[in-house]
């Protein structure tokens, strides 16, 4: 009896471990990986993290970690990750955007809510109940009250589920997970306002 229980427990733990290993890395997981691709002057000096619009789920798998870098003109070094693998390191010029400043560096020690949890919090907003949420775009920046996640969401259209609609965004404190601002428009999906 104990052997059977041990085998079952081992199988469950093995499955859980393999599922965790297959999970996409979160935005915060990628900061440490990104540190390997930037100079000493930029390590842990993140001014922004942003994702591309997710594909096939609410969790994005293409991320851009933007570091403050005083040694180059735009004052940033950007490391791009696709499915957890570094694919590009550069110093992008952003038209109509001023160079980064040291006061834009996000205080990473204040962050307790990672990108996956921010997406869950945004998706659980009461206005979105009943919608088939499909995609997200997630950004982390320094806000007025500390680090903030901005989660933009897309839903399947009610009238034509093959099409999607931008249903707005939610700003979430990365320190405590509280909703700072909700700018949702469920009517864009054909639901109720």
Question: Where are the predicted features?
Answer:
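Bacterial N-terminal signal peptides
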Residues: 10-18
């Amino acid at each position: 009896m104990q052997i059977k229980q041990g085998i079952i427990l081992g199988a469950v733990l093995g499955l859980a471990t393999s599922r965790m290993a297959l999970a996409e890395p979160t935005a915060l997981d990628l900061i440490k990986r990104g540190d390997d691709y930037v100079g000493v002057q930029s390590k842990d000096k993140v001014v922004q993290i942003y994702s591309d619009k997710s594909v096939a789920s609410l969790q994005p798998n293409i991320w851009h970690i933007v570091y403050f870098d005083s040694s180059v003109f735009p004052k940033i070094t950007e490391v791009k990750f696709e499915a957890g693998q570094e694919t590009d390191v550069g110093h992008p010029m952003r038209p109509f955007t001023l160079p980064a400043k040291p006061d834009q560096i996000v205080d990473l020690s204040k962050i307790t809510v990672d990108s996956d949890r921010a997406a869950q919090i945004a998706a659980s907003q009461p206005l979105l109940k009943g919608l088939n949420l499909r995609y997200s775009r997630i950004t982390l920046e320094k806000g007025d009250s500390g680090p903030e996640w901005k989660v933009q969401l897309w839903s399947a259209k009610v009238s034509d589920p093959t099409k999607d609609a931008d249903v707005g965004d939610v700003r979430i404190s990365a320190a405590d997970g509280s909703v700072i601002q909700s700018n949702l428009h469920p009517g864009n999906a054909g639901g109720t306002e």
